[in-house]
């Protein structure tokens, strides 16, 4: 069993020089940044158990909360700033693993996650004289995987993950999205004295529904991965490695549905990743018993990259594809 916690508080009032003009001799003053306070609290607890050498389980609980000011830029010598953000997050997750034999291994895990965020701007020029939004999100997650060792140097695995994500807010006509995700991966690995090869295929099925308005749509995708490591010299620990990965990332609920921030027209971010590398290990002498050198080159081709860009309010950004 393990338990730990952490609390942090900072006023963030760091000093800066405010200049009243750009010409030499213009007045200046020493100021302190305002509305930069941060308070955070985190607590974790874990339980770990072994039913036998081949059967284990784990349980973890987590809680986090924060309160932070959102400072604005000093514009025309006005440093007034009152916007604030509160966050809370908690989850419980468990994992179970059992080796039925040298050939078969089963593993499953489950998780429940809850998060809350509140944003306040008491200086908004509207009929309420403020902007105040609260968002609530939940996730239910379940996964299972099985590993089969066909030979001592050849193994296959099949894993599947399912999750349900929901979001709500105290806003009129909020869309209230629900996302159903199902991911299934089939993988294989072969190892001998001079070659290691791994390959997998990931099938992703995403269905997204909303109670009001428009959703970000449904998605179907099959993405491959392959990697290899080659040892050309029997007596030297020198290896040549490479991998190729085709993957995509969906926009989060925050990216899609947050007030003033979200953009339901966001496309998934797609990436093709390439890597080639060299690794050399050597036992040199008693003074230098172990030497390792690694060099890698990466190439990523990203399309429809999801980025955040500032709006007229520096504390509120918006999302788009690049």
Describe the function of each predicted region.
Residues 1, 39-45, 88-94, 110, ...:
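Hydrophobic, lipid-facing positions within transmembrane beta-strands of outer-membrane proteins
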Residues 10-16, 20-23, 29-42, 48-106, ...:
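Flexible loop and strand-edge segments within Gram-negative outer membrane beta-barrel domains
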Residues 13-21, 64, 69-78, 118-127, ...:
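Outer-membrane beta-barrel translocator domains and adjoining extracellular loop/strand segments
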Residues 155-235, 244:
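Signature of Gram-negative outer-membrane beta-barrel scaffolds
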Residues 7-11, 63-67, 112-116, 162-168, ...:
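Transmembrane beta-strands of outer-membrane beta-barrel pores
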Residues 103-119, 233, 240-243, 269-322:
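Membrane-embedded beta-barrel scaffold of Gram-negative outer-membrane proteins
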Residues 52-56, 99-105, 149-155, 194, ...:
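Short loop/turn motifs that connect adjacent beta-strands in outer-membrane beta-barrel proteins
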